[in-house]
Amino acid sequence: MGAPDSRVVRQHLLDLQSGIVAVLERFDGGRFREDAWQRPAGGGGITRVIEEGRFFERGGVNFSHVIGGAMPASATAHRPDLAGRTFEAMGVSLVLHPRNPYCPTVHMNVRFFIASHPEAAVPPPAAAPVWWFGGGMDLTPYYPYEEDVRNFHRACRAAVLPWGGEPEYRRLKEWCDRYFFLKHRNEPRGVGGLFFDDLGADGKTDFDAAFGLARSVGDAFLDAYLPIIERRRDVAYGERERDFQAYRRGRYVEFNLVFDRGTLFGLQSGGRTESILMSLPPVVKWRYDWQPEPGSAEARLYDEFLAPRDW
């Protein structure tokens, strides 16, 4: 069983960030602003953001590596045994908000945690570091095409199959459907994808296998998303479509600020707020008790896509 190697993970994450940004810049024609930052309490990161691009209204591809003296509450709520441990948390997180409402918003994240006991005198196995990977990707369309959703899920499935076969893919797909769900609205955020967390925290998982799955998910992102926006970037739209896009973006904001573990962890651990909140869309609307017109394209999103299903 391979030993956890945070240096190898860190380098992979930096390479992943750079590779994705290079492709997205070629697609958009604009440049991502790069902002390297240091965290006074330990660690730092590289934020890469595009705003008012030719295609992307707002998007970010962020790397962070945070070092702390005690795990924050969001990370220990379901693992009280980790309270008081020092930690390293590193990851790449991206969110892209295209301007064209026929192009979906997308999110992808790959992260690695390692928590160590601060007291060297603690005997094993209690003193052994606890590590795990998390991540996934999910799609949030406004005017969805079944072809696009199927393309996305095919790429997700292909990323997981070498690391656990069909049962593991089903598990991560269903986990995604459960996780990206707005309980107060009783509706999913989008059409799902993959989600996993605590991979390796049981102490029985091989590090190389866990890292392999996490790496495969990150590497699959461009195959999952790029064909969709290449097909839809020139679809004509008007004020009605932009208005509905802004309304549905409100669900994105609600989920990220109320439920998302990564957002809560970042804020509670003293992460960089500007980088954490880059996931929020630039234009959002809320309406009181709005309902789509029956039979409309907007109603089709609710009736046919916003429910867990096999794609």
Swiss-Prot record:
> What phylogenetic lineage does the species belong to?
Bacteria, Pseudomonadati, Pseudomonadota, Betaproteobacteria, Rhodocyclales
Per the record, the pathway is:
Porphyrin-containing compound metabolism; protoporphyrin-IX biosynthesis; protoporphyrinogen-IX from coproporphyrinogen-III (O2 route): step 1/1
Q: Which cofactor does it need?
A: a divalent metal cation
Q: Membrane-spanning residues where?
A: none
Report the top EC class in one word.
oxidoreductase
Q: Where is this site: Important for dimerization?
A: H184
The family classification in the record reads: Belongs to the aerobic coproporphyrinogen-III oxidase family.
The entry marks the following residues as binding substrate, namely S93, N109, V110, R111, G270, G271, R272
List GO BP terms, alphabetically: protoporphyrinogen IX biosynthetic process
Q: Where is this region: Important for dimerization?
A: 252-287
Catalytic activity field: coproporphyrinogen III + O2 + 2 H(+) = protoporphyrinogen IX + 2 CO2 + 2 H2O
Function recorded in the entry: Involved in the heme biosynthesis. Catalyzes the aerobic oxidative decarboxylation of propionate groups of rings A and B of coproporphyrinogen-III to yield the vinyl groups in protoporphyrinogen-IX.
User: Gene symbol?
Assistant: hemF
Q: Which Pfam families match?
A: Coprogen_oxidas
What subcellular locations does the record give? Cytoplasm
- Ribonucleoprotein listed as a keyword: no
Q: Which GO terms describe its molecular function?
A: coproporphyrinogen oxidase activity; metal ion binding; protein homodimerization activity
Q: What is this protein called?
A: Oxygen-dependent coproporphyrinogen-III oxidase
Keywords attached to this entry: Cytoplasm, Heme biosynthesis, Metal-binding, Oxidoreductase, Porphyrin biosynthesis
Any idea which positions bind a divalent metal cation? H97, H107, H153, H184
Under the heading PROSITE patterns, the entry gives:
COPROGEN_OXIDASE (PS01021)
The family database entries (InterPro entries) matched by this protein are listed as:
Coprogen_oxidase_aer, Coprogen_oxidase_aer_sf, Coprogen_oxidase_CS
Instruction: State the NCBIfam families in the record.
Output: PRK05330.1
List the catalytic residues: H107 (proton donor)
Presence of keyword Metal-binding = yes
